[in-house]
């Protein structure tokens, strides 16, 4: 039989899936990558290559592509199912390289940067009309609302209100055009504001240039604003009755273009969503009623028509319509008609009041006045709605940072372009200028300023186009338009002619071209031809004074609210024009965006037919060119993905350097540049990945930045783990301290139950059996469950589960039994002995597929045990006589035999304990077998020899030997508990507890067994030495066991040097043991003390591998791991296992395997006679107790060879101790070593800082 050894920390194959590496699974939903996800990865950079890559991805249903951190979005004109909650969740907490390109990735980056850098964020979405800008803005709002979710009611309400602004403002600000069914006809900049916890707490919407002309007229197949069709189709009966609401085809303003319905638009559903949005935002029912009352008034104003009277002037065709309009506006009907067909003119001379004239209007002029009234009401109504939404969004204070989302009309080129188009295209020019400033121009200028190595890249700067439109000196197009209006304000045609003449000033501008009644501006997106006719009139943007006075007469408070309160008739100041307003708004927008960190989304429209399958190469190629994607790719490939000032960078990442931080505090004493270098060095960032400028650090690739961010995130997790670990140590120390106090109190009151059980066991022997030295130790107590079978995670629990034992375990220990096969009856097999209140289990182990399994070999009912049989010598064999079972009796060997029979006796008082010169048991049912026992000095010191039914054992202590008293603990300044803050190793040398647990013994087995010579540790606690008068020979023997080299040259300690020798550091490695003949020593109770003369120094030890000689033949069981030996064979031994097996190798190195330790003895080479032994010294009981004390305080070098907890026999431990102490009395040496071995075995304490994996309890 061979001992099967397994790796101490080997993980079972089935547990490998519990690592942090997830098992690879096939993602059936992942689409095959088509093209490249980042245009910077293209092999060739050209407009055609970019176009082809976008086309491949579009045809594959992949609409998003990156240029670095810029997102390119191609409108799919269909639902791809990529905005679900599951997709949204997959982007949370991910950087853009971990997930495919998506608008959610841009939103995640914005929200992360807001929290990480505490800086305002914005996203600039640009592209032509119908490219998908509004949809992208909605998806960003969707993601931010989900990512910042919270259970707080007020925060949730703000998020709902922010999301509700989408359907509300889309209804009032979007319309169907030829290019887009949901085209934004106004600009909107939404700021979502966050509190200090980065939760949305407020919002702000800024409106830019509503296209109010659409209210009164649209080109063919376009529609008015969505709200008119929603209201006319979905209005309630109350509204229809009170406001006279009809179907959209009955109103001129909604039916003139010939398009009242669109296949992809559900007006009835959208109307319900609009009503719901009003309720979420907080509009009262009264406010909703007034809004729809004004919409009805606008529609009915459009139905007012005029005819020419006899004088050629205009008059109302049907006054019932004007009467109903006056009812809705709550003004006088006659005054309304008068304002529509007449114009009041007043003349004056200086301060004198002039005459007032009523000038009749013709049909065309009256129609223009009618439309002006409708446009004014709708424009002011829209502004009021935006202001009202802002009031609701600002209801919660505490905003500190914001994320801005810009959704504005795209670049427009129509067959006929007028004032609205030049305003829209001007704003897009400003946005393009921002993009150029921040991504192209300023980036290259910054590289030069920071002295970064850089090759300049050419690009088109559209600042010249912006100056052409907005400049005041020299005057631009808007300034020229204002001058024309001021010169001929009364006559629109004259003003248009004056404007046309002034346009000649721009004839030398390369981006301007004047044609008859038209002019061309060469925008970045292409050349646009504008009509001069009507521009000056649209630029006035002023309500006729008569209409303003009409509105002020209303009795409707809501209508009065949405219009200015008063009209300053005496003001000579020129009122602001529409051009002035749009320039001011655009500059304010640029200023707002410049205060935030921008993200960019460039949208592309694949075709003009809004088809989900068509991809117009020429149209997309044109957009690729004017968006400047090629230049952006070139700069991104050559530039740096991240740049930050030294101060900001250090503030963000100083935690990554231990030289710059301690416990979260900034500790760097040098300048910020030095801190930046130190951080990058400690983070192991290659120098090729960054450059240091004058004031900023530049990081080349986003992967490097993401790595820094990941390390910073992990820092907090590590800190939290350290705090948790320290807290758990503190709590455990309190628990351990409480247990120690409770144990001490219990022992003080009722005595130690384990020692009381031990004393009962001694009485059972009745002075009839010789004792082993370790059985008489003062620290010896009957602990019972030495394998900790009752714990949850232990080897004993594992054995218990495999054996199918469910009862509480009273006693458990390792042992040996004889091989039952004929011819091998002297071979010992390792077993596990488990005793429960009703049953004695003998558990054997088997090996299959390199795994050890445990099964019950014998199950004995305690009530069936008649007697137990032991010899009167110092062996460890026990025969258990069982009656009523047709099976052989158990015949076992265990070092804790006395404790076993003590527990059996307590569980069954009828069991008889037989002690004699022989052991009788039933080797076969009904057939008694007798085993004799004899004294033999050739037997192993700590074990015995079983052969031919005869046990050979050395002489033991007298049968009437008394138990040594338990040594008293010495007072010390050091803590009795383990050092939780020490980084020293926790081995046998550590001061331990009197009561072991499974964790303590198991740590000893896993961490130190098997080994032939344990290395002494330096972590033992320093105790005060005993008085000089109490240092006897046993103490000297113990010191010799731990320090053989020192002891061979040192004299017996005197009074002066006792303290010094006691606290001396242990040697780094024990010397090679020398075989010494054993000499019996008699014990005496006389308190005499003699000092032994020092022995002569031994010859120098040879530094060679220990050699052993086979004392008996060992045939083995045929296992490949065994090493068969014949008597006299000399081998080298590299390891000795406490279980009684040694790893040996033949001298020629041809074979290596395990042999029983009891079968080999140390091989003595001829090296001269050994030194004579020192004479024995008798010691009193007091001296013996103090020798125990010294044995426990000294380093536990002999613990590895004692191996009691690991299942080794006591005889083997005594033999190993004898070999480790040359020149000493055999009995005294064995006693000293036994003291140290048993004490440390019984006092091992578990260490909560152990590196062992406690969770791997099944891996044995």
Swiss-Prot record:
**Record comment regarding domains:** The myosin motor domain displays actin-stimulated ATPase activity and generates a mechanochemical force. The tail domain participates in molecular interactions that specify the role of the motor domain. It is composed of several tail homology (TH) domains, namely a putative phospholipid-binding myosin tail domain (also named TH1), an Ala- and Pro-rich domain (TH2), followed by an SH3 domain and a C-terminal acidic domain (TH3).
Q: Name one GO molecular function term.
A: actin filament binding
Q: What domain of life is recorded for the organism? A: Eukaryota
The UniProt entry's coiled-coil ranges are none
Q: How is it modified after translation?
A: Phosphorylation of the TEDS site (Ser-355) is required for the polarization of the actin cytoskeleton. Phosphorylation probably activates the myosin-I ATPase activity.
Q: Enumerate composition-biased segments (Polar residues).
A: 948-963, 972-988, 1030-1064
Q: Per the database record, which ranges form the IQ domain? A: 717-737, 738-763
Q: Which organism is it from?
A: Kluyveromyces lactis (strain ATCC 8585 / CBS 2359 / DSM 70799 / NBRC 1267 / NRRL Y-1140 / WM37) (Yeast)
- Could you tell me which residue ranges the SH3 domain spans? 1103-1165
Where in or outside the cell it occurs: the entry states: Cytoplasm, Cytoskeleton, Actin patch
Where are the stretches annotated Disordered?
Answer: 948-1106
Q: Where does ATP bind?
A: 127-134
Q: What does this protein do?
A: Type-I myosin implicated in the organization of the actin cytoskeleton. Required for proper actin cytoskeleton polarization. At the cell cortex, assembles in patch-like structures together with proteins from the actin-polymerizing machinery and promotes actin assembly. Functions as actin nucleation-promoting factor (NPF) for the Arp2/3 complex.
Its BP terms in the Gene Ontology are: actin cortical patch localization; actin filament organization; endocytosis
Q: Which residues form the TH1 domain?
A: 769-959
User: Which keywords accompany this UniProt record?
Assistant: Actin-binding, ATP-binding, Cytoplasm, Cytoskeleton, Hydrolase, Motor protein, Myosin, Nucleotide-binding, Phosphoprotein, Repeat, SH3 domain
- Compositionally skewed regions (Pro residues) per UniProt: 1092-1101
Q: Which InterPro entries match?
A: Kinesin_motor_dom_sf, Myosin_head_motor_dom-like, Myosin_TH1, MYSc_Myo1, P-loop_NTPase, SH3-like_dom_sf, SH3_domain
How is this protein annotated for GO cellular component? actin cortical patch; cell tip; myosin complex; plasma membrane
Q: Per its record, how is this protein called by name?
A: Myosin-1
Annotated region (Actin-binding), positions in chain: 402-484
Compositional bias ranges of the Low complexity kind: 989-1013, 1065-1082
Report which gene this protein is encoded by.
MYO1
Q: Which Pfam families match?
A: Myosin_head, Myosin_TH1, SH3_1
Query: Which residue positions does Phosphoserine occur at?
Result: 355
Q: Which residues cross the membrane?
A: none
UniProt lists the family membership as follows: Belongs to the TRAFAC class myosin-kinesin ATPase superfamily. Myosin family.
Could you tell me which residue ranges the Myosin motor domain spans? 34-713
